[in-house]
Amino acid sequence: MDPFVVLVLCLSFLLVLSLWRQRSARGNLPPGPTPLPIIGNYHLIDMKDIGQCLTNFSKTYGPVFTLYFGSQPIVVLHGYEAIKEALIDHGEEFSGRGRIPVFDKVSTGKGIGFSHGNVWKATRVFTVNTLRNLGMGKRTIENKVQEEAQWLMKELKKTNGSPCDPQFIIGCAPCNVICSIVFQNRFDYKDKDFLSLIGKVNECTEILSSPGCQIFNAVPILIDYCPGSHNKLFKNHTWIKSYLLGKIKEHEESLDVTNPRDFIDYFLIQRRQKNGIEHMDYTIEHLATLVTDLVFGGTETLSSTMRFALLLLMKHTHITAKVQEEIDNVIGRHRSPCMQDRNHMPYTNAMVHEVQRYIDLGPNGVVHEVTCDTKFRNYFIPKGTQVMTSLTSVLHDSTEFPNPEVFDPGHFLDDNGNFKKSDYFVPFSAGKRICVGESLARMELFLFLTTILQNFKLKPLVDPKDIDMTPKHSGFSKIPPNFQMCFIPVE
């Protein structure tokens, strides 16, 4: 048969299939723009500013609407009330994880980030319990973070106040913390394997947030047949997983069931004793994916947030001066910051919260999926339908945070200058899929940033007003722009 005829037949089949899927899926889904065959609503979505794009759709269709990514319908929740109602009030129904083809390719339904159903529930219970046993929320973990903060200060002092790209140095600190929890290792900041690990984690995150990767997620049939950066992602992920499998093998050979050293040991002990959590997957493959998830989540999210924080603090020198004044008054220069200090440092605490609110690192979180046929606000959402939560619409809500596009710690201070909590503070998402490492991440951000500002003045290479905050990519996550700066030791 003529190749051209074959091509036409294939395209015709895809067109008919797309039309059928779109028509059969609409049912009583929330309203939304009419999708085109094959591409759905992609022609209407600005991937460079999807937050504003979703806001514009919400003005037309309301806080709950449907968009088609290719032939796949995705229900979008916009605004605090809709997201709270779904993730909190209907938490069980919205607790599924959306099918993201590129992620599914590397996780194969294992780990904690992209597993489903009973396996995910059991894995989450195991992870939370084990992190608690290892000192999450206690002095045990705080001591690790404080120790790592001092190693970070030593490394920053080695720059001698000269211009440097902080990406790798800043990334080393949170990566060392999670590595010490997972497999009891902290690395020298020049260790080759350590730098390779961080470099590949950084590169994977950038690729996942690139426009090209979004196309492959929308048209997954292209993944196995087209060249692109996603192949580099798969290669990097294979290296990371192989490296961590090596750590697991070392643990198996030296395991003492009466004296667990770290996260891997706790897993291996339950695996060996066969009296663990019901529905838990105790295969080595599951452990390797779970550990990979923890290393990714505990490294790049913190690193990106801290780099954005450095840019903001250099750009807004009056805010930095207030934070450093509070540090001098409460902590001084001769002891390490601790979490108890946070209760006496409302402005610094507000600054850390405002960094996370302002940068809006994960604009739409990770896609959810309804676990059963669900009635939601008079709409019918069939089991398996994907759900996107616009966290931007909550973090930048102008009623809760007046002038949300302005970086202002006052968003988290009351009239008396005391720190005030906000239910709209959702950088870690909400509900049953909320980040398991939230408390650790909050601790690290406070201690690392406070320790940096206690020891250094931050000097940009350009005029503060010219500092560009525009992310390199803004997809799955926002990637900070490349920049150089100077860390000037405080005398």
Swiss-Prot record:
Organism superkingdom: Eukaryota
One of the Pfam families matching this protein, by short name: p450
Gene Ontology annotations of biological process type: arachidonate metabolic process
Main location: endoplasmic reticulum
EC number(s) per entry: 1.14.14.-
SUPFAM superfamilies tied to this protein: Cytochrome P450 (SSF48264)
PROSITE patterns cross-referenced by the UniProt entry: CYTOCHROME_P450
Pathway linked to the protein: Lipid metabolism; arachidonate metabolism
Binding site for heme: C435
Job of this protein: A cytochrome P450 monooxygenase that may play a major role in the metabolism of arachidonic acid in the intestinal tract. Exhibits regioselective hydroxylase and epoxidase activity toward arachidonic acid, producing 16(R)-hydroxyeicosatetraenoic acid (HETE) and (14R,15S)-epoxyeicosatrienoic acid (EpETrE) as major products. Mechanistically, uses molecular oxygen inserting one oxygen atom into a substrate, and reducing the second into a water molecule, with two electrons provided by NADPH via cytochrome P450 reductase (CPR; NADPH-ferrihemoprotein reductase).
Family listed: Belongs to the cytochrome P450 family.
Protein name: Cytochrome P450 2C40
Name of the gene: Cyp2c40
